[in-house]
Amino acid sequence: MLVVTAEQMRELDRLTIERFGVPSLTLMERAGEAIAEAILKRFSAIAKRGVLIVAGKGNNGGDGLVVARLLKKKRIPCEVALLARQEDLSPDASHNLLGFKKLKGKVTEISPDGIDLLGQRLTRSRLLVDAIFGTGMKNDVRGLFADAITLMNASGQPIVAVDVPSGLDSEMGTPLGVAIQAEMTVALGYPKLGEVTYPGLGYVGDLVVAEIGIDPRAVAQVAPGSELLERRGISWLVPRRAADSHKGNYGHLLIVAGSRGKTGAAVLACRAAMRSGAGLVTLAAPGSLNSIFATSLVEVMTEPLRENSREEMEPLSDDEWRVLLERKNALLFGPGIGVAVNGATQNTLRWLLRHLAMPWVIDADGLNNLALGLTHLRHAKTAPILTPHPGEMARLIGKDTAAVNADRIGIARAFAVEHRCHLVLKGARTVIATPQGKIFINPTGNAGMASAGMGDVLAGILTALLGQGLNAEDAMKLGVYLHGFIGDRVAAASGEVGLIASDIINGLPAGLSALAAAKS
């Protein structure tokens, strides 16, 4: 599903109206119809006890006035509280105000010194419709509007927001001083970026997307470039298995991972890769740890690496790397590998950046090694998939975690484009970015997945999908969605508390099967 910025939505509206001949009143009518339908579907019983439309003077208010008229026609008791003078309304809003008044609909103008009047109207209603501001808000909400939003939130009545909760920055998802806490938001045309990511998700409530007739030619011209992943689009990416296939058809992965005290990261990544359908997996790790891996990973081959007295891996020669990479078709570097004092891990990563000619993933300590020499990334022979959590992302860009979380989409897109890599910025609503600047937002996953080892599992999943022939973009989309999808299945069955990384691994076969079944 496409996701847009406020500027992109304005341009889509403009092109649809001016170039492709759809009257603005027609778009407004369609918007109002969709909102009214959503209200009656979700809040039918409550609406019959009284609806108050709180409207501004612009086209968002106009949408609300269409809703008022349509509800009035269906004999739903409905009033309008107008946070403006009637003569100041936009032309389209004014037209729809007249339509409501022709049905003898009650309209109350609320002035800055008459906010108590709004309070009285709120107590007489059981459902509120927020039609104050649209997507264009950038400055803090003040005065009458801030007072109105505060009163609406404090009323205890469910609120339906028109397009975007008033007071919410539709792109960043942050409240502009104060914002409507909606129980449901009806996004018009397409959801806005701030509605599908945090913190905006905490204000939107249930998100309903309404088709209002934006011309497809306008969409092609604007090319929004951001999408919310959906199950129906992901299911087609699940690899299928031919009846006469063999293990060689599903990839041979090389996983370079593990160090003293961090063997679990390597184990989780290898197990996740196998459970995600990889045909063969070889783990390359410091030789002193080989007995641990040989015992715990019975389906995985091991390649003991030379190490120094500190049990850190020693750099391999070019010839040794060529032998190790022979007949492999995807690589994972980093889970639990540490940051070697002697520079061996950094040097190994730089060799891979210069020479590796297969799809690959850099995760965990691999990213910490990368942060020590980020300039090498732009010259990678094969663009890797990077999988940072916000702390690792902060180290990569030299900022703090708060700065990363304040603009996850912007930072992910800028980094992927500048460094010509694929990026998975993990967290609630994981952000996927491509070297071309495309963005994908993942809706799956839950707070139970905030536990150790989840990133190692995701890295193993991604590498397995690369090994089975998916390109980097498709592997990221399927892998990230699948990871959270299984987490949601586990949480639904046994709760979020106590959910561990191994639960995701154990759920991979059934999760893949469930996703694949959605194709039919």
Residue ranges and their predicted role:
Residues 1-83, 90, 195-364, 368-385, ...:
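Small-residue (G/A/S/T)-rich helix-start motifs and N-terminal tracts that mark the onset
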Residues 68-154, 291, 296-307, 319-327:
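N-terminal small/polar loop signature for handling phosphorylated ligands or for N-terminal nucleophile
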Residues 110-114, 156-158, 341-343, 358:
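Generic structural signal for short, solvent-exposed loop/turn connectors between secondary structure elements
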Residues 125-127, 132-134, 138-224:
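Internal gly/pro-rich beta-alpha loop/helix module
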